[in-house]
């Protein structure tokens, strides 16, 4: 293994319960419930029309600009106190000590990624940031971002390991031929992460050496020989 590829939201830090509560409150203010099952379909994806779902429930059009502004204000306030998930800084330190490459592979916009890795105190040491910048054709669960990350780092799929918290992210890594460690949070722990090669419930006390040993010992191997990566042309990405 030469490189580790990390999802951001829900993996390196965990804003998911807060974001779910914010949207749930909006639904409740309009007389409806945003169920956990409906929210599970949103996690790790982009382009899902939550306001469209709310309009269907209420039977009327909503001022989406007002709703977006309300959600943005609450996110600005409530996410400001969050830091990296416990154990994440230590795992990144172990990654650097082992001489491994690392990149962020996230569906969030680059500006969001930069802001919150800085807030979490983990902004240093990344070789690159990979974001679809709102393009659903490049976003997880498609393998595009992972193939882009592999090409940028110059590593083959079997030389990388991904860390993800959601089914969408795990599927994206799997489709790119990258072995995956599932590190679910409270919002994703009950979801189907069975495509992952390894599951850990917490980063606290995690030894990278042990994780990599268990990954290498898994009888399931990435079936991508790298040809898909070679055939997949990628645009320039944003590098820290």
Predicted regions, residues:
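Metal-dependent phosphoesterase signature
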Residues: 33, 53-93, 98-100
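Conserved phosphate-coupling serine/threonine residues in phosphotransfer and NTP-handling enzymes
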Residues: 11, 106-108
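Conserved SAM-binding loop
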Residues: 12, 84, 162-163
